Amino acid sequence: SANAKIAEGFLCDANGPANGKDASGVEFSCTKGGDGKYSWRSKQTSNSGSGSSIFSLGALGSKCSKEGEIGWNGLLVAACKSGVVKYALVSDVPATPASGYTSRPTWYPTLTQILGGPSGIEPTCSPSTIKFTKPVIALDKLAPSIPYGMMVSDHVTPIDHAYLGVISLAIPQASRTANDYIAVTAPADGVITELSSLGSPSSHRVVINHGCNIYSVYMVLNKATGVLADSFSKLSNNGFMSLSIPIKAGEEFGRQRDNMLDFNIFDGTQWLSGFANPYSYLTQDTWKPYTADYLPLFTDDIRAGMEKQLQRTSAPRIGKIDQDVIGAAAGNWFLAGTNGYGGNLTSAYENTTVQVPGGSVSGKNTYAWSHLAIARHEVDTSKWILSTGWYKDSKGDPVQFLINLTAGQVAPDKLTASSGAMVYTLSQFSYIFPAGTPARVDGSSEPYPVGYTLGSGTSVGSVILQVNSDNSLSIEFASTFTSDKRTYKR
């Protein structure tokens, strides 16, 4: 029955009914969480009324009395405008300080608000009390791993997670058996709060709350097993499960064989200072500024084993995703007229009283169509990558190119308004393996070796960049600006 699909935490259709009742008659609202997904939340916690005893602002469209007030309403950052709760726009929040934010601005939601749900309780203990005493992948099963910050396909901006390699990837796909699956285990005690499908029978997401503001996240997990076996057997019916399953350090919750395992840590007490405009991440991936280095959490022996397999050999070994240089070309950019990471036009947020769906943009091939990043490569940090969601197709055709700096040419992190327009040549890039690297097995998908570097490949033409006096960036894939010039903002 339809009611069977309505339950706390189950996914709902953003374009379907806004309210519903479960089999017991409890009322739920279809609400958007900080992860961009819509799920059923009880009306007692979804803050669907005109006010709230927990949050200063109510739901979109409800009445408010404190003009200009900005705050979290349980689902999003809102503002009181002319007595009505509306989306907070970038013009409503304070401008980023010249030196950037070194800690969370008061208007930005906490990690607990983002990942803990509307009824989440802020922890009072310190993250320093959490220690990862078990590996996620047994060290003898771990293969070379990609650090934070890769730019690939429609992951246009540097990715906020690592990819842990597994030795089964060295086996040709056609030769892999059930015995080649490798256990994925919890690094510390915690509570599994989410199991969801990423759209494929062999790709899942798991979130573990370790307490004290530390969360670990795992994606493209091939199988959910162990303590998640029962939940996994029911997952196909709804695609998303909000859970509360205790797990101990070293306890298995999944198996991996056919791809690298996405892994990262969020720490609600840390803040990445290298984002020039944190507001841009309110529309999707709101957790991004809380991305933290997982290496210090592990015991020394496990840390050493994981570091040994990280492809990047320069500090920080885990990589860096926040590469914005205020006043220069380096870092993340979003097409002028769009509202940050979500990819929708700002106009979609201005007067709406319903939540703007996340994860896709109507009429576009990808939400990242409006993204642009000019950042150092995640492994070979001597090389600069231009990553764009819109190359030739305005609907979105994400691609990454190597920027070939010539002698005396200003690097992107030094390209400022005073530099004027700068033309860079772009090329495909090749991978150069360290001497003595064994030949790759045909049909395998083993990760590239630790310490590889990039070489310049086939030329793809030029790009012209100019930082403007208002700190926006003009770009065109040509050697001179024409009417096709685009402008991006932070």
Predicted features along the sequence, with ranges:
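Residue-level "contact hotspot" at macromolecular interaction interfaces
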Residues: 57, 183-186, 240, 246
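Aromatic/His-enriched, Gly/Pro-containing loop or helix-boundary segments
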Residues: 219-244
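Short hydrophobic beta/alpha edge segments that flank linear recognition/processing sites
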Residues: 204-207, 244-267
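Short, compositionally biased
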Residues: 261-280
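Surface-exposed, glycine-biased beta-strand/turn segments
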Residues: 100-204, 212, 224, 248-249, ...
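Tryptophan-rich substrate-binding surfaces of secreted polymer-degrading and adhesive proteins
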Residues: 3-99
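Hydrophobic beta-strand signal
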Residues: 13, 65, 72, 185, ...
